[in-house]
């Protein structure tokens, strides 16, 4: 047996089965595999009937389901040979398979503007004096407008005063610790839409983490586990890759949202001031409680949600359809 180590959701992944026989016999082979996605908890039993020709060695490809991302574990439940009529069977001795493969979500590039919100704590904030960033609450430098600059960067009062467009460059915070919260749910009541939502949440989580790394911003990724919260610090590409492998192996959250007390312990331990929650379910009471602890931005992934943002409450809420995320149509987010 040969199973590739990785694939991307929706792409082909196949288990290679090589059959070697001492004599060319036309007996058929019956194989049964048990597959489990550790992320979603979904189990599947796969039964394969092979009909080898007369060659001593033959290879077969068994396609596997990659509709949903996650870490898949594959075991051989039974294997044997059966006669042409399927009446008599003989099990194979000493044949086993304990394989696994990681199916990654679609990878997309997103530019994010992590601005310090009105609920953020300003105490102890410091900024890089040599590099510009995306925190528009602190000015890095003032300069003349250049082609390609966003009009959001224009300082209109100074521009009117001096007669030329003046741009306000944002600063790069050096102790502005950001947390990404995974909040995808393993509910089965949405049918096929559940796979799309899970893929979209994991795609968005990976895109935000990579976008922060590109800006030189180390950050923390948090998800629920049996003990309350699993925390990983991301400050390099190697750390990002390890985080993705871990997140795709950890079971999705139950219907209950993040435990505010568990998150508060993480927030204090890691000095978190900005939190980006990626979720497929909105729990208003829990979000209000989180917003009281941290500067909170929420990315809500919905099956049929209309794209848009709401900044009227205690946190910034952005709605994005799942198919828009996996389709790579989201290019910029202000969080």
Feature map (PLM): residue ranges:
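An amphipathic, basic-hydrophobic helix/alpha-beta surface used to engage anionic
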Residues: 1-230
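Exposed, interaction-prone extracellular/peripheral surfaces
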Residues: 48, 124, 147-335
């Amino acid at each position: 047996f040969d199973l590739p180590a990785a694939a991307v959701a929706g792409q082909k992944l196949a288990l290679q089965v090589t059959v070697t026989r001492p004599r060319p016999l036309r007996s058929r082979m019956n194989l049964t595999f048990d597959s489990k996605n550790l992320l979603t908890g979904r189990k599947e039993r796969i039964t394969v009937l092979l009909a080898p020709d007369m060659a001593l060695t033959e290879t077969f490809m068994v396609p596997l389901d990659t509709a949903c991302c996650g870490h898949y574990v594959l075991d051989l439940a039974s294997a044997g040979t059966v006669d042409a009529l399927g009446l008599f069977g003989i099990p194979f001795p000493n044949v086993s398979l304990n394989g696994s493969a990681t199916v990654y979500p679609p990878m997309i590039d997103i530019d994010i503007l992590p601005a310090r919100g009105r609920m953020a704590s300003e105490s102890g904030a410091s900024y890089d004096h040599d590099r510009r960033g995306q925190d528009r609450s602190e000015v890095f430098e003032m300069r003349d407008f250049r082609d390609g600059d966003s009009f959001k960067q224009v300082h209109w009062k100074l521009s009117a005063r001096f007669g030329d467009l003046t741009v306000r460059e944002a600063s790069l915070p050096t102790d502005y610790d950001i947390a990404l919260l995974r909040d995808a749910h393993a509910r089965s009541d949405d049918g096929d839409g559940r796979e799309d939502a899970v893929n979209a949440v994991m795609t968005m989580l990976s895109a935000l983490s990579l976008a922060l790394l590109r800006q030189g911003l180390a950050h923390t990724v948090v998800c629920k586990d049996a003990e309350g919260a699993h925390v990983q610090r991301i400050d390099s590409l190697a750390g990002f890759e390890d985080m993705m492998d871990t997140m795709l192996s950890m079971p999705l959250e139950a219907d209950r949202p993040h435990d505010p007390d568990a998150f508060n312990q993480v927030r204090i331990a890691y000095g978190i001031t900005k939190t980006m929650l990626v979720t497929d379910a909105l729990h208003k009471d829990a979000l209000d409680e989180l917003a009281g602890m941290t500067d909170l931005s929420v990315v809500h992934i919905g099956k049929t949600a209309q794209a848009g943002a709401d900044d009227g409450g205690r946190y910034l809420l952005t709605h994005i359809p799942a198919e828009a995320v996996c389709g790579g149509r989201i290019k910029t987010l202000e969080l």
